[in-house]
Amino acid sequence: MASSDLEQLCSHVNEKIGNIKKTLSLRNCGQEPTLKTVLNKIGDEIIVINELLNKLELEIQYQEQTNNSLKELCESLEEDYKDIEHLKENVPSHLPQVTVTQSCVKGSDLDPEEPIKVEEPEPVKKPPKEQRSIKEMPFITCDEFNGVPSYMKSRLTYNQINDVIKEINKAVISKYKILHQPKKSMNSVTRNLYHRFIDEETKDTKGRYFIVEADIKEFTTLKADKKFHVLLNILRHCRRLSEVRGGGLTRYVIT
């Protein structure tokens, strides 16, 4: 064996021995009461940092949405400005006069010998069949929004919460329209959805309107991410919905 190979082998063995010594010393450190207290404090600080990172992530998402909205507004204002400038430069020198027509004719203008035409009443239309009403989630009021703790709503706005309620109502209406639809008129896709809806019902949801995350993905553009679940916490706080769990599913019941 060459001397260089022997030196490399010795170096490798010494490195392994050093790693073992460090591991043993760290394990022994973890058993000391004073160091346990320090490790517990570090664990608590890591939890706090994780919460701050979650809030920071929500703040970044909010700022991105605000930035996109401002860009759209700026583009819209530029278009409006161009239209106004075009109108300003192309105003005609003479505008047509508006002619006023009298809707009622005075009695003195009528010819007494001319027979008066009596209009026949239109046939009464049959009222449409009553459609089964679907319960929707009421929007959040300003007072309710102000009553939500600041740590819960973070940077979320009043309009953002009500926009989510609008999307949830869209999912509820789409789901229960299928459930109220005659089975004969269903295609294969609708029939599969119908059977899924029936399978998801339990004795606790009987007679109540509810959706699951799959309905959110099926009927809306919402994403079931951290922000969505923060919004659900706010809706639970405002008593707009409750949860029924079972069979690996969380059912969001409209209250």
Curated annotation (Swiss-Prot):
Subcellular location as annotated: Cytoplasm, Cytoskeleton, Spindle; Chromosome, Centromere, Kinetochore; Cytoplasm, Cytoskeleton, Microtubule organizing center, Centrosome
Outcome of substituting R245A: Decreases microtubule binding
One GO molecular-function entry: microtubule binding
PTM statement from Swiss-Prot or TrEMBL: Phosphorylated by AURKB at Thr-157 and Ser-242 which negatively regulates the association of the SKA complex with kinetochores to allow correction of aberrant kinetochore-microtubule interactions and promote mitotic sister chromatid biorientation.
Modified residue annotations for Phosphoserine: S242
Motif (SXLP motif): 93-96
Source organism, top-level taxon: Eukaryota
Sequence segments annotated as region (Flexiple loop that anchors MAPRE1): 92-132
Documented effect of changing R236A: Decreases microtubule binding
PTM sites of type Phosphothreonine: T157
GO cellular component: centriolar satellite; centrosome; ciliary basal body; cilium; cytosol; intercellular bridge; kinetochore; microtubule cytoskeleton
Biased composition regions of type Basic and acidic residues, renumbered to the chain: 114-131
Renumbered residue ranges of the record's region Disordered: 106-131
Family (UniProt): Belongs to the SKA1 family.
This protein's name: SKA complex subunit 1
Source species: Homo sapiens (Human)
Gene: SKA1
